[in-house]
A protein has these predicted regions:
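N-terminal secretory signal peptides and thylakoid transit peptides that target proteins
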Residues: 2-18
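Bacterial N-terminal signal peptides
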Residues: 16-27
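Boundary at the C-terminal end of the N-terminal hydrophobic targeting segment
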Residues: 29-34
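Extended ligand-binding clefts on enzyme/binding-domain cores
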Residues: 39-79, 86-91, 121-157, 163-167, ...
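Non-membrane alpha-helical segments in proteins
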Residues: 92-102, 114-118, 171-175
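Alpha-helix exit/C-cap motif
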Residues: 99-104, 175-178, 182, 245, ...
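Alpha-helical support elements that line or immediately flank enzyme active sites
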Residues: 99-106, 304-305, 311
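N-terminal glycine-rich cofactor-binding segment that shapes the pocket for flavin-like pterin cofactors
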Residues: 163-171, 175, 179
Length: 480
């Protein structure tokens, strides 16, 4: 058994599968670390992926060290300066922690701990409430005024990213739980339990199929009020995975309200399964604001791929195929408002069904064929998980081919996008990070993505390349 807990027999099966299809992935090399011989063509592909991963990690380091370095408590800026300035999104930093912990070098683990300490500081000093929640984002370009030496301050004007969506809380909690498992440092578990208890106390919902509501927003009077949004399938997937981790770490311990973490995880799962459309083979996005009525449009990618990563249940494996069939696109220079030029073309996944039919009145410069590189990496991770869980399935060969195809397209995007972008005014080398999307992309939820270098997209690319699963404690899609 290797250090990730994957039985060597299963690794050898995966190696044989790769050899049979003529493919080679950094994912397998990172999983096994067994240096199993491959064909010369496969070896070249593996070397390319390894180089791509090393460059991607360098981008993550650049973004993390833009304003401070070493052990200074901080979070990493999410996008290049050209997008949202020195803003660090809580979710993006959780993904960055996962990517660092997956590679497991001494420096990577140290960086994950620094970001984890940043989350702990952000939680303890969160404005305007420090009751265990995290804000959506923070500013990371100035010293905090409290003398702590941390580079984390509230993300006020002009964005006011003070709200606390349940998905962001769960992602921060999962990253902290993973840090606790890796380091056994109590402060990470303490912070994870604080945010978990905030979720339970503030969003546990009994309307309709139950689950957890969207979260809280901060109004103009700096008061915390429930979000008017409907319940989110994605948020409940995240919460199910997070509370399942806590059940394992605490040996099925209880939340502050006395309920077991496993029962609280089941409450989220009940909602998720109620959102499944068996006729269509996909999960709905969630409910409308009444917390009961299913919201039929748009249908997002993350619910399809993340549900499999969280559940590892082949009864719902077809949701991956639904996303591939209905959310795959190719961005070319001929596409409306594309940022591509010449003969460039990138194939991958979009955010949701609304992305393919953009609203010209709201977003006149959106490209209906823009590729969401983070979502493409979600699909890579889900496909690798399906290969590992259902290794006897004939579809594993097709899944591997799709993985290699998406990885190749992502490597192309990595090498060609992001020229002229900066962090803290300093140029970011071309060919390291991945942009959020190849062109401006309408999500259908009132915001867009664009071709700005992004630690979230890059972090998920690294997770996918290494076959990681952040919804499972220890990142394993297989249990020993």
């Amino acid at each position: 058994m290797n250090k990730n807990g994957i039985p060597r027999r299963k690794l050898l099966d995966f190696a044989a599968l790769i050899a049979a299809t003529g493919l080679s992935l950094l994912a397998f090399a990172q999983f096994s670390q067994a240096q199993i011989p491959a064909s010369s063509g496969s070896a070249l592909q593996a070397a390319s992926s390894k180089t791509s991963a090393e460059k991607a990690y360098q981008f993550q380091n650049t973004m993390m060290d833009a304003y401070a370095s070493g052990s200074t408590v901080r979070l990493a800026q999410s996008y290049s300066d050209q997008a949202l300035g020195a803003t660090a999104f809580t979710y993006d930093n959780a993904v960055a922690i996962d990517a660092y912990l997956l590679r497991e070098s001494h420096d990577d683990v140290a960086r994950a701990e620094v970001l984890g300490n940043g989350l702990i500081y952000a939680q303890a000093t969160n404005f305007p409430f420090n009751d265990g929640r995290f804000a959506q984002a923070y500013f990371v370009n100035t010293l905090a005024p409290d003398g702590s030496g941390a580079y984390i301050t509230p993300a006020g004007f002009p964005f006011y990213f003070y709200g606390s969506a349940v998905g962001d809380q769960a992602w921060a909690g999962m990253a902290l739980a993973q840090l606790y498992r890796r380091t056994h440092q109590q402060q990470y578990l303490t912070a994870a339990l604080k945010v978990a208890n905030w979720i339970v106390a503030n969003t546990y919902n009994t309307l309709g199929p139950g689950g957890y509501s969207f979260g809280s927003v901060i109004n103009q009077f700096n008061q915390s009020v429930p979000s008017p949004n409907g319940k989110s399938t994605e948020h409940n997937i995240d919460t199910y995975a997070f509370f399942s981790m806590l059940a394992e770490i605490t040996h099925n311990g209880n939340a502050a309200n006395g309920a077991s973490w496993s029962s609280l995880a089941q409450h989220a799962l009940d909602f998720v399964l109620a959102m499944y459309n068996p006729a269509g083979g996909y999960f709905y996005t969630g409910t409308l604001g009444d917390q009961v009525t299913i919201n039929p449009f748009p249908i997002p990618e993350d619910c399809q791929d993340w549900s499999y990563l969280a559940l590892l249940n082949n009864n719902y494996a077809n949701t991956i195929d639904w996303a591939l069939a209905n959310l795959q696109t190719t961005d070319t220079a001929a596409s409306p408002h594309s940022s591509l030029t010449g003969s460039e073309k990138i194939t991958g996944i979009v955010f949701d069904t609304a992305s393919l039919s953009t609203n010209p009145a709201a977003y006149p410069f959106a490209d209906p064929t823009a590729v969401w590189l983070e979502g493409t990496a979600h699909s890579v991770a889900a496909l690798i998980a399906r290969i590992m869980v259902g290794r006897g399935s004939p579809s594993r060969f097709k899944d591997l081919e799709t993985v290699e195809f998406f990885v190749n397209n992502s490597e192309t995007a990595q090498s060609e996008f992001g020229a002229g972008q900066t962090v803290n005014g300093m140029p970011i080398p071309v060919g390291e990070g991945l942009v959020a999307s190849t062109s401006v992309m309408d999500t259908g939820f009132g915001y867009t993505y664009g071709p700005s270098l992004h630690i979230g997209a890059t972090g998920w690319y690294l997770i996918g390349l290494q076959g990681g699963n952040p919804f499972q404690l220890g990142y394993r899609s297989l249990r020993p």
